[in-house]
Amino acid sequence: MEGGAARIGGRVHRLPQGYLALVVPEETILARGTTDAAADVRCQGTIVAEAAPQDPTWSDVPGELLTFDDPQKRLPRIDRLEGFHPGALSLYQRVLLPIRGANGLRAAAWAYVEGELARRS
């Protein structure tokens, strides 16, 4: 596993349960996570992430970009840890977003954003 600093456009707020949640502009979501981790990894590999226009009403949210040598095995485990259940109400949902790395890298990366269950809280 490798890591590095990254940024995305969005907002972070605290849920009533005390957890932090990321909210992103709907139009920046490139894909949504599914139950097929291998297909999700292939999808990520085919998308060229263009720089999303920076809307002044959204913030530049710092985060950490992690890369794995075995994402097909890791994604389902991380999904469970984050409480993401594709096709069901979830506290978080996994979405593919354009990110900007510290070195100027632009890429598409999976992130966990506020899910329907959190919005109902």
Task: State where each predicted segment sits.
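Glycine-aromatic micro-motifs
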Residues: 1-121
